[in-house]
């Protein structure tokens, strides 16, 4: 089976390295920068892999699975890869933040080919091909034949990959956590900043707006989700840095639209006010300009 991982950053590097451990898989990675091998520091020890590294779409050919792990704002560049990778039977998995996995890529591939995925694999990339994986992590995909086929790709790995009967709710719950992380990008302070009650109140407000919009979109979100998100942030490592924070600190583009902007956009569609998320988007946009 031929598998292409588009975007071998932190999560993509982990995915590609683990898939490459199966000798039945021919794994290749679609990257901007060439590297000699993947080295992943996993919870169980070092993991190495030598997938084929492609640096231009014209080097690619049709595969059985195209797994997208790029940033959400890289859809157009990813589309150039998909044009070469997709054949008559190719399946596409989108492992990204947000709740618009399918919509983001329908300009490039038919919606019925796309398997959206909610990923929880804490990892950081230190250099091309060099990644630290903090936990084995989990991936959730929708129930159905495509979801089951995706789960089967990972049976040889310690990553927990499961189907869920309510993917929409799973995606919005992940968004609730992600949208609260904007306070870290704004303050440039790690997770411990949530210990302060004024900051926790802002996080609760961000998540509360997410809950209202998510429910309007059909997600089954509990009323206590804002408190659950704050409690989770407070219980985790105080020095934890989320990807939005890390990207702003490094001067990289941020996934602001997928994490907070989408709440504002969809809220407007439903007539739901989202002033706190709108303020966060405006402030971070200004900070990045």
PLM segments and residue spans:
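A generic structural motif
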Residues: 23-27
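NAD(P)-dependent Rossmann-like dehydrogenase/reductase catalytic/cofactor-binding core
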Residues: 204, 208-289
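Extreme N-terminal starter segment of soluble prokaryotic enzymes
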Residues: 1-4
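Rossmann-like NAD(P)(H) cofactor-binding subdomain of soluble oxidoreductases
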Residues: 18, 30, 34, 38, ...
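Active-site-proximal catalytic alpha-helix in oxidoreductases
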Residues: 168-212, 237-238
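N-terminal Rossmann-fold NAD(P) dinucleotide-binding loop
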Residues: 12-13
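Glycine-rich Rossmann-fold phosphate-binding loop(s) that bind the pyrophosphate
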Residues: 8-9
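Rossmann-fold dinucleotide-binding core
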Residues: 95-174, 180
């Amino acid at each position: 089976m031929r598998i292409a991982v588009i975007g071998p950053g932190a999560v993509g590097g982990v995915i590609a390295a683990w898939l490459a451990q199966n000798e039945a898989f021919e794994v290749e990675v679609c990257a901007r920068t060439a590297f000699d091998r993947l080295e992943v520091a996993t919870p169980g020890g070092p993991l190495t892999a030598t997938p084929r590294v492609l640096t231009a779409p014209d080097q690619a050919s049709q595969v059985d699975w195209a797994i997208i792990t790029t940033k959400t704002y890289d859809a157009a560049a990813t589309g150039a890869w998909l044009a070469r990778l997709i054949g008559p039977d190719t399946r596409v998995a989108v492992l990204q933040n947000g709740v618009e996995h399918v919509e983001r890529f329908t300009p490039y591939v038919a919606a019925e080919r796309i398997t959206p995925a909610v990923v929880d694999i804490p990892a950081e990339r230190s250099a091309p091909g060099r990644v630290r994986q903090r936990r084995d992590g989990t991936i959730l995909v929708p129930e159905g034949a495509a979801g089951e086929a995706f789960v089967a790709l990972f049976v040889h790995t310690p990553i927990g990959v499961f189907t869920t009967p309510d993917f929409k709710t799973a995606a919005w719950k992940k968004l609730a956590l992600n949208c609260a992380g904007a306070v870290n990008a704004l303050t440039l302070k790690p997770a411990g900043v949530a210990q302060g009650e004024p900051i926790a109140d802002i996080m609760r407000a961000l998540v509360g707006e997410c809950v209202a919009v998510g429910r309007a979109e059909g997600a089954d979100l509990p009323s206590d989700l804002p408190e659950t998100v704050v409690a989770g942030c407070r219980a985790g490592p105080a020095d934890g840095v989320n990807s939005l924070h890390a990207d702003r600190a490094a001067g990289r583009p941020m996934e602001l639209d997928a994490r907070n902007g989408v709440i504002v956009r969809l809220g407007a569609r439903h007539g739901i006010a989202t002033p706190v998320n709108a303020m966060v988007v405006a402030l971070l946009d200004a900070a990045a300009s």
